[in-house]
Amino acid sequence: LSPGTAKTLVEALADGGRARIKGQLAEVPLGWKVRRIDFGAGPQWAMTIPWGDVTTAWQSTGIANIQVFVPTPRWLIWAAKAGNVTRPLMSLPAIQGYLKSLVDRRVKGPDEQTRARLTTHVWGEARNGAGEQRVIRLRTANGYALTVDGALAVRRFIEDQAPAPGCYTPSKLCGAQLVEELPGSGRFEVSEC
């Protein structure tokens, strides 16, 4: 976790969680849903978090109900749930300042060697109205490298293809396969449940 990411999380504490419910962006409690998920390296506890994917995935797919899960130690899940009680305090400038100063003192972020060693395991689950279910998994480079490589790939695509002006998610602009073409990425693996 980089200091910048940690500070973004501190800022988000006061806002609670987010999910897409029946096509609408909805506020939900922190740690709203908890379950065990095999992201690709064995089952782990995971909880919902308010990442931007609840918006971008909806823009890309039109899927009406979207939650984003991240692997989380159980103690942190319970801390997030307990944090729902103290959420009103989290927006106070003094609390924000104190928590960010803790980040400055304690969070150093992954160094280059650590980042080179890390991979990201992405998991998705979809169900249709008939109850059919599919799971998709993807292994990529660490999140920092993926972000840089993805941004550069989109830039090259725009330069080469000159798409119509507008607002796009990367998959709507370049196709879902873009992520498979990035350094350190594998292929999508789809399975029935």
Predicted features along the sequence, with ranges:
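C-terminal helical cap and adjacent loop that interface with cofactors, partners, or active-site loops
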Residues: 111-193
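Active-site-lining helix/loop region of Rossmann-like oxidoreductase modules
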Residues: 1-127, 132-135, 145
